Design a protein with these regions (language model features):
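N-terminal cap/lid segment of alpha/beta-hydrolase-fold proteins
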Residues: 46-115
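Short beta-strand element of the alpha/beta-hydrolase
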Residues: 119-127
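Cap/lid segment of the alpha/beta-hydrolase catalytic domain
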Residues: 129-138, 155-179, 223-225, 255-256, ...
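Short amphipathic alpha-helix adjacent to the substrate-entry channel of hydrolases
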Residues: 136-154
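Primarily recognizes the serine-hydrolase "nucleophile elbow" in alpha/beta-hydrolase
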Residues: 182-266, 272
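Short beta-strand/loop motif that positions the catalytic acidic residue
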Residues: 279-281, 285
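Conserved alpha/beta-hydrolase "acid-adjacent" motif
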Residues: 287-292
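C-terminal catalytic histidine-bearing segment of alpha/beta-hydrolase fold enzymes
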Residues: 294-297, 301-346
Length: 346
């Protein structure tokens, strides 16, 4: 009989717990979905939020590792609550999505490529408004696609929540210490430091970010130095990605500027050393105005950074890889593949 206190037994119990929570979430979804429906089809568009205190863990196909050395005191997010996992209230392509929040122990999960290994790697930065991390919609589902293209995928679960407050005249203000950026920079250093063991080329490690994760990708692309004190040899590696893909990013455009102006927010740094960048955005995005991508793209161009921008009339916000009636949701993955070929990554 297996020892119930062994690491294997504890791991098995956590998998069972995760499965039970998924069932509970699904039950909550099915029960609540009757109230919010579209008039045209009767299909649900919103569901009741259900959350439970638990730590998000990757499935058996991923190798989940801590970002920071054990015992190192790192800054906690803006809450003492234990980590939670729950579902968003808005269905995406008729399906629920899962988030993690109150993350104080950030991790990265490595998913190996399927088929021939191109030795390229992509660090996935999900969105969630810096309040949560969209772990499946803009995380594991993205990694499923990336690994099918022969690339290693790394999913970052970064520290949240961290509020972007509104100060004088209700103007948004960036946090002084951006914890998600620290986690992203740490992950890039670890990936380069461990490149040979992960089977990746240390010069072909990029990022793909969604919504708030798009801003995080931009911040990592332009930071000239680390935003924390180095802790080990991994922090001697470059923390700048080799390429960057941003989908419907926010926190970039200065919304105080006239609508015709494309001025960046004061906290956005632009470096001539930023990597080749691809921006994808829908013009009717109700959450993060398309001007976030426009302003950032033009600033990169003015700095001499290679940048491509693809805008669609419709598509909304936070669709991930889930297909809807909007062409952007089905066409952007192939755009990314062709762009990666053009910049010499694949």
């Amino acid at each position: 009989m297996a020892d119930p206190n062994s690491s294997a037994a504890r791991s098995a119990l956590k998998r069972i717990e995760s499965s039970l929570i998924s069932v509970l979430l699904a039950f909550g979804v099915s029960y609540a979905a009757l109230s919010q429906t579209t008039e045209a089809t009767g299909a649900p568009t919103e569901i009741k939020k259900v959350s439970r205190p638990m730590v998000w863990e990757a499935g058996p196909e991923g190798n989940q590792v801590p970002l920071w050395p054990e015992g190192l005191a790192i800054q906690r997010p803006e809450s003492d609550k234990p980590e939670e996992v729950g579902n968003g209230s808005r269905l995406v392509a008729g399906r629920p999505w899962t988030w993690a929040s109150y993350v104080s122990h950030p991790t990265m999960t490595i998913y190996p490529p399927k088929g021939q290994n191109t030795r390229a790697a992509v660090l996935v930065l999900p969105g969630g408004g810096y309040a949560a991390v969209a772990m499946d919609l803009e995380g594991t589902e993205i990694c499923d696609w990336i690994t099918q293209k022969g690339m290693t995928c790394i999913l970052l679960k970064y520290r949240v929540p961290q509020a972007w407050r509104h100060g004088k005249d209700h103007v948004e203000e960036a946090p002084k210490a951006q914890l998600p950026l620290q986690d992203a920079q740490r992950a890039m250093g670890l990936l380069r430091h461990r490149a040979s063991s992960y089977g990746i080329d240390p010069h072909k490690i990029g990022v793909i970010g969604f919504s708030a994760g798009g801003h995080l990708a931009a911040a990592a692309s332009n930071a000239e130095k680390r935003t924390y004190e180095p802790v080990d040899a991994a922090d001697r590696e470059s923390s700048r990605p080799d390429f960057a893909i941003l989908l419907y990013p926010g926190h970039l455009w200065d919304e105080r500027s006239p609508e015709r102006a494309l001025e960046l927010s004061p906290w956005v740094e632009i470096s001539a050393h930023a990597p080749p960048t691809l921006l994808i955005h829908a013009m009717n995005d109700p959450t993060d105005d398309v001007r976030h991508s426009m302003a950032y793209g033009m600033a990169l161009h003015d700095a001499g950074v290679p940048v491509d921008m693809r805008f669609y009339a419709k598509g909304g916000h936070a669709f991930g890889l889930r297909p809807t009636s909007a062409p952007i949701t089905t066409e952007w993955p192939e755009l990314v593949v062709k762009w990666l070929q053009n910049v010499g990554v694949r």
